[in-house]
């Protein structure tokens, strides 16, 4: 096989130009990288590679080491130690590498002539090269060991020389002078003899300078404590609310430093106070660490994970919520659909709690939820929108779009449920349906007639006109959306309403959203738990179970839960108690944190504006939803000068304990659809506690507003009653300067407040001291009359000035 210069250069580990140069030096000219090399020319190339240049440095394998001297000082004697002459090998790595490379190239050519494959030759070369590198490393290590050995020998010889010198300097035993205990040239002084403890003849240990000792010292220095140069950044995991001390411990810092940061942020707390997760994250970032929001798996989470549901879902009735402004006919429309008279039973003709009913229309079951329209029941409407599938927005054709109508639209858009607009009261004269559609379109509620996606149905709750069309629209929407839920397994739902009822106890209205609620199930609702003793539907019929989309009344809970609380059925009462206790403990932490924040806020407000007037209120209502709505409405009445504080609230009648608490806290007792018992009434009379009863929510709110208005400081206003021009100044020994004036407008009264104006600028604000007409003192002077005015504590009145006479009037302020 013919080989080119290029091929041979790869085998020889040389460039093609180097191969061409070697051939030219051997007498083979005219070659380039692509030229073919014959067998004869390869032999010439092999012969050229075998000729190695002889250099003097390569002939001497060993040379004598140079002489090294170590100087050692012992007291005043300096000793110079000359080490032995040793021989050590000198490795000529570069020259040997060249020799080995030439030998490998020559071997490659020989193998090529023998007919071996070029790839095999390359592999053999790589193996031999690796072996050569290994041998070179071993040879270098041998040299280092030899150097180390020479160094140790030199150090030992130096130590021996020093030992001999020390021995020579010691005096002999016979010539050793006697040491007397107290002999001295001065009798008053005493010589002290310092000897080594335990062993007087012991020499001080010399510092070990061996290689091993130095290595150990280096390792000890490496592992010794070093003050950190850079600040350590911690990753701090924050799970919910956290104590200040615990947060400081996680950041490995002092709690006082954390308090300083919190004070800088305007948060006034102590070491044992609890701060919320957001505040803790800000503190961590402010102190240069990295905050991580961590979610701790609680007992509640574990319990919910253990609940097993059947994955098979079946069709369920749609849940429809009726929303809108107060007095727009929501309950009346639902009454017509149910063929009932609920609206007549509502006090004041307005709904004040959530009502839930099931209606059968054309063979289809529909669940209706009626919500209050009054402004105070905003949270109730939002709860209704959260649990619903379809919203019926009722708009009165005569009133049009009102504030609660707009609020209901926003609630629906936030939740993202379909909406059907029922334009009610079309039986009245002068109604304009198109105008209502136009106003609704400004809130992105566009009718299908106008190219939108919202069904709008004109109806009349009085005559029943359009009600069937409304029910058909509901059924059509439900059919399109195909509402379904898991019907087997533990029940899951929401508390719509809760109350205390005489003879029945705690009654909770819930809406089952999935699963099946059976009599005897263990149920958790908010902070309350218990065994389901009785299930009653909206018609008063006792049931054994409740399916999805059914609103039912349940008896058996330990207390009255809040409206909107989640309802879960669990396996045992013990687990239910654990979850309820866990929720109560978390709620206590939140309430404590709110109280701390409120105390600090009140303290700061008092520092800025003085004391704030407070109206203390103790509230009792018939149902939990009404109590929650009233608390929110009353707290919204608070201003910077006067605020409402609900010291206690509850569900049920007013008892003696409530009156005692009200007397202690100087609170006004408000009963909404409840009354005080005989004992409570007697205690209230004895303690002087004011008790008020209400059945309409806005009457209660208006009365509290009036009480708050009475605590407001009066508003001061100024009424200008006259203006007089100064014509001349008269001197009086008794009265001082008297301004002779002409009354231009109104009148001037004795003892009135005045202002002196010069060039329309107020230069003095004071009181009128004297008023005379000629030489007589008068009480008042009317317009167009001259008079003399004496100004109290002011003598700089000049002709041309104006005197403005005014009075301050206090006016009661109203919220």
Swiss-Prot record:
Kindly list the positions annotated as binding GTP.
Answer: 324-331, 370-374, 424-427
Report residue spans for region: G3.
Answer: 370-373
Q: Is Cell wall biogenesis/degradation tagged as a keyword?
A: no
What molecular function terms (GO) are annotated for this protein?
A: GTP binding; GTPase activity; translation initiation factor activity
Q: Where is this region: Disordered?
A: 153-219
Coiled-coil parts of chain: none
The lineage's top-level taxon is Bacteria
Q: Where in the cell is it found?
A: Cytoplasm
Q: Locations of Basic and acidic residues compositional bias?
A: 153-176
**UniProt region (G1), positions on chain:** 324-331
Which portions of the sequence form the region G2? 349-353
The family database entries (Gene3D superfamilies) matched by this protein are listed as: P-loop containing nucleotide triphosphate hydrolases (3.40.50.300), Translation factors (2.40.30.10), Translation initiation factor IF- 2, domain 3 (3.40.50.10050)
Name the UniProt key words of this record, in alphabetical order.
Cytoplasm, GTP-binding, Initiation factor, Nucleotide-binding, Protein biosynthesis
In this chain, the stretch annotated as G5 covers: 460-462
What's the short name of a Pfam family annotated to this entry?
Answer: IF-2
Entry's InterPro entries?
Answer: EF-G-like_DII, IF2_II, IF2_N, P-loop_NTPase, Small_GTP-bd, T_Tr_GTP-bd_dom, TF_IF2_bacterial-like, TIF_IF2
Please classify the protein's predominant subcellular localization into one broad category: cytoplasm
List the biased-composition ranges (Basic residues): 191-209
> What GO CC terms are in its UniProt record?
cytosol
Similarity section: Belongs to the TRAFAC class translation factor GTPase superfamily. Classic translation factor GTPase family. IF-2 subfamily.
Q: Please explain the role this protein plays, according to its UniProt record.
A: One of the essential components for the initiation of protein synthesis. Protects formylmethionyl-tRNA from spontaneous hydrolysis and promotes its binding to the 30S ribosomal subunits. Also involved in the hydrolysis of GTP during the formation of the 70S ribosomal complex.
Protein name, entry field: Translation initiation factor IF-2
What lineage does UniProt assign to this protein's organism?
Bacteria, Pseudomonadati, Pseudomonadota, Gammaproteobacteria, Candidatus Pseudothioglobaceae
């Amino acid at each position: 096989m013919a080989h080119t210069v290029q091929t041979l250069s790869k085998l020889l580990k040389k460039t093609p130009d180097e191969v061409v140069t070697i051939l030219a030096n051997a007498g083979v000219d005219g070659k380039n990288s692509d030229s073919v090399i014959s067998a004869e020319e390869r032999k010439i190339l092999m012969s050229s590679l075998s000729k190695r240049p002889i250099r003097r440095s390569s002939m001497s394998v060993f040379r004598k080491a140079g002489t090294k001297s170590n100087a050692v000082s012992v007291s005043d004697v300096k000793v110079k130690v000359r080490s032995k002459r040793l021989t050590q090998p000198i490795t000529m790595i570069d020259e040997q590498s060249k020799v080995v490379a030439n030998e490998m190239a020559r071997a490659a050519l020989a193998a090529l002539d023998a007919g071996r494959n070029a790839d095999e030759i390359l592999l053999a070369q790589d193996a031999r090269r690796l072996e050569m590198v290994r041998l070179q490393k071993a040879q270098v290590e041998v040299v280092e060991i030899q150097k180390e050995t020479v160094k140790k020998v030199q150090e030992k010889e130096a130590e021996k020389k020093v030992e001999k010198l020390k021995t020579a300097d010691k005096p002999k035993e016979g010539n050793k002078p006697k040491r007397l205990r107290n002999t001295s040239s001065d009798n008053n002084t005493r010589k002290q003899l310092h000897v080594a403890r335990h062993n007087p003849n012991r020499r001080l240990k010399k510092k070990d300078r061996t290689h091993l000792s130095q290595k150990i010292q280096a390792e000890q220095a490496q592992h010794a404590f070093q003050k950190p140069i850079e600040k350590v950044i911690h990753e701090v995991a924050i799970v919910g609310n956290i104590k200040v001390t615990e947060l400081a411990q996680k950041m490995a810092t002092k709690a006082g430093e954390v308090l300083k940061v919190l004070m800088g942020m305007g948060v006034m707390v102590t070491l044992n106070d609890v701060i919320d997760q957001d505040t803790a994250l800000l503190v961590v970032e402010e102190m240069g660490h990295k905050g991580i929001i961590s979610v701790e798996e609680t007992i509640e989470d574990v319990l919910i994970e253990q609940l097993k549901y059947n994955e098979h879902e079946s069709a369920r009735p749609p849940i429809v919520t009726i929303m809108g402004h107060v007095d727009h006919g929501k309950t009346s429309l639902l009454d017509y659909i149910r063929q009932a008279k609920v609206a007549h039973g509502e006090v004041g003709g307005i709904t004040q709690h959530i009502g839930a009913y099931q209606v059968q229309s054309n063979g289809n079951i529909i669940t209706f939820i009626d919500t209050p329209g009054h402004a105070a029941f905003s949270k109730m409407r939002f709860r209704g929108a959260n649990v619903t599938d379809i919203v019926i927005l009722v708009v009165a054709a005569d009133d049009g779009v009102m504030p609660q109508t707009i609020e209901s639209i926003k609630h629906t858009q936030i939740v993202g449920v379909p909406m059907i607009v029922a334009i009610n009261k079309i039986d009245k004269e002068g109604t304009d349906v198109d105008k209502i559609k136009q106003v609704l379109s400004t809130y992105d509620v566009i009718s299908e007639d106008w190219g939108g996606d919202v069904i709008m149905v004109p109806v009349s709750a009085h005559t029943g006109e359009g009600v069937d069309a409304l029910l058909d629209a509901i059924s059509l929407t439900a059919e399109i959306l195909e509402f379904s839920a898991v019907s087997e397994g533990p029940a899951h739902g929401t508390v719509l309403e809760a109350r205390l009822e005489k003879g029945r106890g705690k009654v909770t209205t819930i809406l089952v959203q999935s699963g099946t609620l059976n009599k005897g199930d263990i149920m958790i609702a908010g902070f309350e738990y218990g065994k389901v003793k009785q299930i009653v539907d909206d018609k008063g019929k006792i049931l054994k179970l409740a399916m999805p989309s059914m609103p039912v009344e349940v008896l058996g809970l330990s207390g009255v839960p809040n409206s909107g609380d989640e309802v879960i059925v669990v396996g045992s009462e013990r687990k239910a108690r654990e979850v309820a206790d866990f929720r109560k403990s978390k709620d206590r932490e939140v309430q404590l944190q709110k109280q701390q924040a409120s105390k600090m806020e009140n303290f700061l407000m008092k520092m800025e504006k003085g004391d704030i007037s407070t109206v203390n209120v103790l509230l009792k209502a018939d149902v939990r939803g009404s109590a929650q709505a009233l608390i929110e409405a009353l707290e919204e009445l608070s201003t910077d000068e006067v605020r409402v504080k609900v010291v206690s609230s509850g569900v049920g009648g007013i008892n003696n304990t409530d009156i005692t608490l009200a007397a202690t806290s100087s609170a006004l007792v408000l009963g909404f659809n409840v009354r005080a018992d005989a004992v409570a009434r007697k205690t209230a009379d004895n303690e002087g506690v004011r008790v008020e009863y209400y059945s309409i929510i806005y009457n209660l709110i208006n009365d509290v507003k009036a009480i708050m208005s009475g605590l407001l400081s009066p508003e001061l206003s100024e009424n200008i009653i006259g203006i007089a021009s100064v014509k001349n100044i008269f001197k009086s020994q008794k009265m001082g300067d008297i301004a002779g004036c002409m009354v231009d407008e109104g009148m001037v009264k004795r003892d009135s407040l005045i202002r002196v104006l010069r060039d329309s600028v107020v230069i003095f604000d004071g009181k009128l001291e004297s008023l005379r007409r000629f030489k007589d003192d008068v009480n008042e002077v009317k317009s167009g009359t001259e008079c003399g005015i004496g100004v109290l504590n002011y003598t700089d009145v000049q002709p041309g000035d104006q005197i403005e006479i005014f009075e301050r009037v206090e006016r009661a302020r109203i919220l």
